[in-house]
Amino acid sequence: VRDGYIALPHNCAYGCLNNEYCNNLCTKDGAKIGYCNIVGKYGNACWCIQLPDNVPIRVPGRCHPA
């Protein structure tokens, strides 16, 4: 497990406006908790704590939306 910005396909972070959205998103995928990191490295994006290794996280490099 690890902490990180949960990722959409193509290395894009999930944008957010509130903690409830991120907590639901993160815990649905097995994380302990999640919150909306306001004005973080990737803008307002969901950060997950103790996210399972099989769930993709945002890594350095460009976001390539479909």
UniProtKB/Swiss-Prot annotation:
Localization terms from the record: Secreted
Keyword NAD part of the UniProt annotation: no
InterPro entries: LCN-type_CS_alpha_beta_dom (IPR044062), Scorpion_toxin-like (IPR003614), Scorpion_toxin-like_sf (IPR036574), Scorpion_toxinL (IPR018218), Scorpion_toxinL/defensin (IPR002061)
Keyword Secreted: yes
Disulfide bonds listed in the record: C12-C63, C16-C36, C22-C46, C26-C48
Pfam families: Toxin_3
UniProt GO MF annotations: sodium channel inhibitor activity; toxin activity
One of the record's GO cellular component terms: extracellular region
Stated family: Belongs to the long (4 C-C) scorpion toxin superfamily. Sodium channel inhibitor family. Alpha subfamily.
Domain notes: Has the structural arrangement of an alpha-helix connected to antiparallel beta-sheets by disulfide bonds (CS-alpha/beta).
Biological role: Alpha toxins bind voltage-independently at site-3 of sodium channels (Nav) and inhibit the inactivation of the activated channels, thereby blocking neuronal transmission. This toxin is active on both mammals and insects. It can be considered as a cardiotoxin, as it can bind to human cardiac sodium channel and modify its normal properties.
Misc. remarks from the entry: Exists in two forms, due to cis-trans isomerization at 9-Pro-His-10.
This protein's name: Alpha-like toxin BmK-M7
Source organism of this protein record: Olivierus martensii (Manchurian scorpion)
